[in-house]
């Protein structure tokens, strides 16, 4: 009986800590961006629309432009490539 009470106590403590840490919350992104847990390490920008990363092919979590748009580094927003300055 004591063993089961201890297991229940551990589960309650872990669940409480996880809910307080907000690990299940998906970050809110700016307009025209979507959150990805594994986005491109070198996303396309107006300045470099077809980046050739010499890095190891890794990904990073964050907010990225939705498909079809690229980042305008001067304005910090995602726009159609045809609108790049």
From Swiss-Prot:
* A matching Pfam family: TIL
Instruction: Enumerate the UniProt keywords alphabetically.
Output: Disulfide bond, Secreted, Signal
Highest taxon of the source? Eukaryota
Quick check: keyword Disulfide bond in the entry? yes
Tissue-by-tissue expression: Expressed by the venom gland.
Where is it found, in Gene Ontology cellular component terms? Answer: extracellular region
Q: Which residues form the signal peptide?
A: 1-21
The UniProt record lists the TIL domain at 29-84
- Protein's UniProt keywords contain Protease: no
The entry's localization annotation reads: Secreted
Disulfide-bonded cysteine pairs: these are 29-63, 38-59, 42-53, 46-84, 65-78
Q: Which family does it belong to?
A: Belongs to the serine protease inhibitor-like (TIL domain-containing) family.
- Function, as annotated: May be a phenoloxidase inhibitor that stabilizes or inhibits venom phenoloxidase while it is stored in the venom sac.
Protein name (database record): Cysteine-rich venom protein 1
């Amino acid at each position: 009986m004591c063993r089961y009470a201890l297991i229940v106590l551990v589960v309650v403590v872990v669940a409480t800590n996880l809910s307080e840490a907000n690990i299940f919350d998906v970050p809110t992104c700016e307009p025209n961006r979507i959150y990805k847990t594994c986005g491109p390490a070198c996303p396309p920008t107006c300045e470099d629309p077809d980046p050739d990363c010499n890095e190891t092919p890794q990904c990073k979590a964050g907010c990225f432009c939705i498909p079809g748009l690229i980042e305008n580094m001067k304005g910090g927003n995602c726009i159609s490539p045809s609108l790049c300055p």
